[in-house]
């Protein structure tokens, strides 16, 4: 009938709203466009930066050459760091205890070793990666027996040449970061960056994000937050 056809035509002409969302890019994609990046993760918030560090380490390894005669290590690129804009990475991970670090420590150990090889064969190069780990469950004033924990960690590092908690060359800090000291150190001392060069990327709890955002504003660092 005409009425049936009319209703069918009206349904066909009716506009159906369509909403298209995403994909949304991550702020981490800007990392390689920066000169000096500070990657900060709170707990599992470090996950977005694991792949970045893994990729950077792969670039070092891809250009590594081992001599068949003497097993000496060299790199095919004159300067890996000169070939890209990114010159320096500070990796900061704030976590409750050592157990939460275990899954990622192997990658950090490998990167430390790769950097040592690279610096040994390129004496004029500067350190590319600095690692800063924080255990928040342990306090500065804690003792092992009657001996201060801080003293034990220092002696162990001197004797063993590695951190007592992680076996990394980088020192593990106990307690929460003192952000004024951390950020102040980025723009002071030898080979320091300028505030304009420092870009801070963070992923973690919102309360921690606000604290870091405020300090970035004070030091005039660019701040990027990955949704936790």
Which residues are covered by each model-predicted region?
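Reductase modules of NAD(P)H-dependent flavoproteins
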Residues: 1-30, 72-228
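Beta1/beta-strand and adjacent pyrophosphate-binding region of the FAD-binding site
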Residues: 35-42
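Classical protein tyrosine phosphatase
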Residues: 42-68, 80-92
């Amino acid at each position: 009938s005409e009425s049936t056809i009319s209703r069918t035509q009206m349904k066909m002409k009716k506009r159906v709203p369509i909403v298209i969302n995403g994909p949304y890019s991550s702020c981490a994609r800007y990392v390689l466009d920066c000169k000096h990046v500070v990657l900060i993760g709170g707990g599992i918030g470090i996950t977005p930066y694991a792949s970045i560090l893994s990729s950077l380490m792969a670039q070092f390894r891809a250009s590594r050459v081992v001599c068949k005669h003497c097993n000496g290590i060299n790199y095919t690129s004159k300067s890996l760091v000169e070939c890209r804009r990114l010159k320096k990475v500070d990796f900061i991970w704030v976590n409750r205890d050592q157990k939460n670090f275990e899954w990622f420590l192997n990658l950090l150990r490998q990167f430390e070793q790769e950097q040592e090889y690279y610096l040994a064969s390129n004496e004029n190069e500067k350190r590319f990666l600095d690692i800063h780990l924080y255990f928040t469950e342990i306090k500065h004033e804690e003792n092992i027996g009657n001996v201060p924990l801080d003293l034990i960690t220092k002696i162990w590092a001197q004797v063993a040449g590695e951190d007592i908690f992680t076996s990394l060359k980088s020192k593990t800090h106990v307690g929460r970061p003192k952000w004024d000291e951390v950020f102040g150190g980025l723009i002071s001392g030898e080979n320091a960056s300028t505030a304009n060069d420092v870009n801070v990327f963070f992923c973690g709890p919102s309360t921690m994000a606000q604290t870091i955002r405020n300090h970035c504003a004070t030091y005039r660092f660019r701040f990027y937050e990955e949704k936790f």
